């Protein structure tokens, strides 16, 4: 998903009062803590969320880590491409103070560390696999991620999403029990053909591309739709009665409050 979420200019005055399974905290509670960090995941829990959306890619040594971009530049005090880093470099990277000095010393978590956090707090993970240019092959990317996932605490539920069809096919072949979600910013004209080609019944769609006719059709087909990344309950109010499954948001508190 985009590194920058759409936000309302004013704080909503009334929440949506949704069920906890309908609210996924985007990169954790990323409006109040540095995105994709353990602090953001704990903050999501503190706001009442029990599903956390987060991004995973590989370091140059093959370690799966929780980060959105192909570099550490935007969300840390350091610079450099993931492909040029190894796990031993993580301790020297401050992934918190860019957001607020309070979070100085926050680390980029490994996938294993994130899953341990989820197990501790009873969280489920909406894991977006990021495939960056000039990095690992699809097989290495999904293989290394799957190797960590299969050793997770069995209490941690995982849904896998990606913009990349090949990534979804690859990870799905490694574990057919995983829920797979197709990610789209805009709905392609051939969306029906794409979905027919992969074992998924879940769509993650930019909320700005969501329409009532589309939602009506996919719900009729038994598909689940989650809308990203919306921070104002009013923007999605008309869609819940039509079967919208969940929202992915930087502000889970707005959607869980009444």
Question: Language-model features: where?
Answer:
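Phosphate-group recognition and catalysis centered on beta-loop-alpha active-site segments
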Residues: 1-258
């Amino acid at each position: 998903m985009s590194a920058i979420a759409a936000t309302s200019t004013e704080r909503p005055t009334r929440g949506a009062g949704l069920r906890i399974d309908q609210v996924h905290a985007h990169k954790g509670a990323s409006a109040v803590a540095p995105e994709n960090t353990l602090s953001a995941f704990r903050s999501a829990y503190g706001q009442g969320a029990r599903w956390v959306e987060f991004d995973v890619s590989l370091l140059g040594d093959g370690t799966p880590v929780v980060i959105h971009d192909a570099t550490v530049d935007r969300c840390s005090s350091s610079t450099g491409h993931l492909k040029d880093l190894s796990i031993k470099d993580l301790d020297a990277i401050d992934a918190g103070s860019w957001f607020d000095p309070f979070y100085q010393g926050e680390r980029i978590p490994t996938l294993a560390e994130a899953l341990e956090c989820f197990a501790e707090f009873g969280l489920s993970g909406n894991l977006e696999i990021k495939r960056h240019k000039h990095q690992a092959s699809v097989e290495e990317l999904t293989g290394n991620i799957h190797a960590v996932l299969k050793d997770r605490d069995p209490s941690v539920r995982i849904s896998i999403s990606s913009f990349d069809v090949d990534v979804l096919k690859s990870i799905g072949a490694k574990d057919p029990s995983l829920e797979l979600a197709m990610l789209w910013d805009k709905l392609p004209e051939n969306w029906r053909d794409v979905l027919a080609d992969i074992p998924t019944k879940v769509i993650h769609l930019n909320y700005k591309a969501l329409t009532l006719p589309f939602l009506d059709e996919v719900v009729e087909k038994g598909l689940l739709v989650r809308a990203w990344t919306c921070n104002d309950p009013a923007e999605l109010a008309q869609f819940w009665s039509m079967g919208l499954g969940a929202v992915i948001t930087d502000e889970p508190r707005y959607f869980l409050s009444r």
